[in-house]
């Protein structure tokens, strides 16, 4: 029996079109200039496919590798460069250190008594033991550490939610909502959507749950002025159905996944579109 056809979804393209059409001119830290709106939300049903943008080719290796790096708790760009990923190069210091960025806050949030909190391990434990909790949250926005970071967190806060089984023999469904305080729509947001969708799949596998929705919520949602031509090109393209994600093994813990454990199939996409990064 053939698998049912996957629907074509355009949440991301609709978002981009909305900001490009209705955004206001606004300055920014980089001096580039943006077109911006405040507040937007997208919802992706992870059972309909893996939400990897199709109107341009997205570099999946960088997304997977960066997420695995976050989960190590490392602050070193060397870890990424050793694996051929250069997306953090513009912010790395001479010694390769990035300060207490995402992974450090996820895995080693410092406490006043000199200890550390592993937020990710706490999430896994809570999903397994108290799935109805409304406190299954990870924050990267550590106010005391912001000035030490090479780049302050853009995707700053996320929460998990388990919908209970609806019938005997079913499993609960895991959803995730991200709050992204600063959203570079052309370059950054496609990475962020796919990264947190992947993390939701990994968490679900580790906690014996099905996947539900990924909800992306943005604060300052902007298109840089030097991305306008690229955005017009991308919006001229028709999206394809999302690909499917396959996790090829179940490791002993969330922290034992390897790059080769993930396979994205049937990724139909338009050609890549290059654009400068605002630093």
From Swiss-Prot:
Catalytic activities: dUMP + (6R)-5,10-methylene-5,6,7,8-tetrahydrofolate = 7,8-dihydrofolate + dTMP
Keyword Calcium included in the entry's annotation: no
Presence of the UniProt keyword Transferase in the record: yes
Pfam families linked: Thymidylat_synt
GO terms, biological process: dTMP biosynthetic process; dTTP biosynthetic process; methylation
Active-site annotation: 154
GO molecular function terms listed in the Swiss-Prot or TrEMBL record: thymidylate synthase activity
Superkingdom, natural source: Bacteria
Protein location: Cytoplasm
Binding site residues for (6R)-5,10-methylene-5,6,7,8-tetrahydrofolate: 59, 184, 278
Keywords from the named record: Cytoplasm, Methyltransferase, Nucleotide biosynthesis, Transferase
Pathway: Pyrimidine metabolism; dTTP biosynthesis
GO cellular component: cytosol
Enzyme class: transferase
PROSITE patterns associated with the record: THYMIDYLATE_SYNTHASE
Enzyme nomenclature, EC number: 2.1.1.45
InterPro entries recorded: Thymidate_synth/dCMP_Mease, Thymidate_synth/dCMP_Mease_dom, Thymidate_synth/dCMP_Mease_sf, Thymidylate_synthase, Thymidylate_synthase_AS
Residue positions binding dUMP: 29, 134-135, 181-184, 192, 222-224
Gene3D superfamilies reported for this sequence: Thymidylate synthase/dCMP hydroxymethylase domain
Assembly and interaction partners: Homodimer.
Described function: Catalyzes the reductive methylation of 2'-deoxyuridine-5'-monophosphate (dUMP) to 2'-deoxythymidine-5'-monophosphate (dTMP) while utilizing 5,10-methylenetetrahydrofolate (mTHF) as the methyl donor and reductant in the reaction, yielding dihydrofolate (DHF) as a by-product. This enzymatic reaction provides an intracellular de novo source of dTMP, an essential precursor for DNA biosynthesis.
HAMAP family: Thymidy_synth_bact (MF_00008)
Protein family membership: Belongs to the thymidylate synthase family. Bacterial-type ThyA subfamily.
NCBIfam families: PRK01827.1-3, PRK01827.1-5, thym_sym
Entry protein name: Thymidylate synthase
Species this chain originates from: Paracidovorax citrulli (strain AAC00-1) (Acidovorax citrulli)
GN (gene name): thyA
């Amino acid at each position: 029996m053939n698998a049912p056809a996957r629907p074509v979804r355009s949440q991301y393209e609709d978002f981009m079109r909305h900001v490009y059409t209705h955004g206001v001119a606004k300055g920014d830290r980089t001096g580039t200039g943006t077109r911006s709106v405040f507040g937007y939300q997208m919802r992706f049903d992870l059972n309909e496919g893996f939400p990897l943008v199709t109107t341009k080719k997205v570099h999946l290796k960088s997304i997977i590798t960066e997420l695995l790096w976050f989960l190590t708790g490392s602050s070193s760009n060397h870890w990424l460069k050793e694996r051929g990923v250069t997306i953090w190069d513009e912010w790395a210091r001479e010694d390769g250190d990035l300060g207490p960025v995402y992974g450090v806050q996820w895995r080693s949030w410092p406490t006043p008594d000199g200890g550390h909190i592993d937020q990710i391990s706490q999430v896994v434990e809570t999903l397994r033991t108290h799935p109805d909790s409304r406190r299954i949250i990870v924050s990267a926005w550590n106010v005391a550490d912001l000035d030490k970071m090479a780049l302050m967190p853009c995707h700053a806060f996320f929460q998990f939610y388990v919908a209970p089984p609806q019938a005997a023999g079913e499993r609960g469904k895991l959803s995730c909502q991200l709050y992204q305080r600063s959203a570079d729509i052309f370059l950054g947001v496609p990475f962020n959507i796919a990264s947190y969708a992947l993390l939701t799949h990994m968490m679900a596998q580790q906690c014996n749950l099905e996947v539900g929705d990924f909800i992306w919520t943005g604060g300052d949602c902007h298109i840089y002025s030097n991305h306008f031509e690229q955005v017009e090109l991308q919006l001229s393209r028709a999206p394809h159905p999302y690909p499917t994600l396959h996790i090829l093994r179940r490791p002993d813990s969330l922290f034992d996944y390897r790059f080769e454990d993930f396979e994205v199939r049937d990724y139909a996409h338009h050609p890549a579109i290059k654009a400068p990064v605002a630093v």
